[in-house]
Amino acid sequence: MVGRGEVWWGESPDEKGRPYLVVSRDAANESMRRMLVAPVTTRLRGLPSELALGASEGLPVESVASFDNLRPFPKAMLVRRLGSLGARQHEICRAAGATLDC
């Protein structure tokens, strides 16, 4: 099962493959075909809506999950688990709150 706070490699026919951070809740992830994800990028802008990721989350270089670009993504196109936020899952709510200006 794909879980909240996990970093996965995603393949889409519309764009190049890239890592994604799963942000949708686990109860929805079990039954939905699409999950809410934050795309991961190496373009660090220092925004409060970014969540820093790196080697401890399974990425080869310093990166961020961009919550300003949240999107639904087909679960079937998440092809390989790279890592997880682990105890840092609470940071998902912080970045989402910054995105929504809450």
What are these regions (language model features)?
Residues 16-55:
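Compact nucleic-acid interaction/catalytic patches
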Residues 57-102:
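C-terminal terminal-subdomain/extension
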